[in-house]
Amino acid sequence: MILDDLVAVTKIRLARHQRQQSLADLKQTVAKMPRNHKPDFLTRLKQPGLHVIAEVKKASPSKGTIVTDFPYLAIAKAYDQAGADAISVLTEPDYFNGHLHYLKEISQQVSVPTLRKDFTIDPYMIYEAKANGAVIILLIVAILTDQQLRDYRQLAEKLGMHAIVEAYTAAEVTRALQSGAKIIGINNRNLKDFRVDFNNSLKLRAMVPDNIPVVAESGIKTQEDVEKLAAAGFNAILIGETLMRSNQKRQLIAAFKERA
């Protein structure tokens, strides 16, 4: 399964990073960071309308290289100027061609919150996200225990961050809710085989109480898709490949927000 492979390579990368910089040193780096003055992500999600999380992504396990020309800073700035509410940055290198320095540079250059899009399996990675400018992390229910879901979210909040707790099945939505998640992501992509079912998020939306913001992820391609998700009561959409392949990124974000 692809997800198992992703977790395996993440463990190897984590061990390498821990050898390069200890957790104690990383905590010191985080402690010295200036206060974040970007808009609060959770507060923004609770405002009316459908919010857009625009993703900076060069490749994926299912599609391989999505774009060969990858001016990541220019892309992120275009998202920001187009009115994206947050920017997701892939930092997983082996399957997504991501890198932490993309996150750090983008976080320094945009006015909106940034999300570290990676496979968080250890508290070290949360401190690492913070040190590189992220104010949002992703917690994937399928790869974490109930205790980890709760502990990692609470650590993120202690550091002034938010966590999107991502689910794919009804059982995972239940676990996300039981963990105390304050933002839930419903993925249309099965991370075990990377197949996409757009209707997955529509089917599971009703499980989440209206007081908890919900993000629809993956397989969102058209304005009709966006309208369906808005009508279903989603608070936000995360769009990656569709934006990355578009030559009119600003116009596409503006159109999605307008039609929603």
UniProtKB/Swiss-Prot annotation:
Coiled coil: none annotated. Its EC number is 4.1.1.48. It catalyses: 1-(2-carboxyphenylamino)-1-deoxy-D-ribulose 5-phosphate + H(+) = (1S,2R)-1-C-(indol-3-yl)glycerol 3-phosphate + CO2 + H2O. GO terms for molecular function: indole-3-glycerol-phosphate synthase activity; phosphoribosylanthranilate isomerase activity. NCBIfam families: PRK00278.2-4. PANTHER family: INDOLE-3-GLYCEROL-PHOSPHATE SYNTHASE (PTHR22854:SF2), TRYPTOPHAN BIOSYNTHESIS PROTEIN (PTHR22854). This is Indole-3-glycerol phosphate synthase. It comes from Lacticaseibacillus paracasei (strain ATCC 334 / BCRC 17002 / CCUG 31169 / CIP 107868 / KCTC 3260 / NRRL B-441). The gene is trpC.
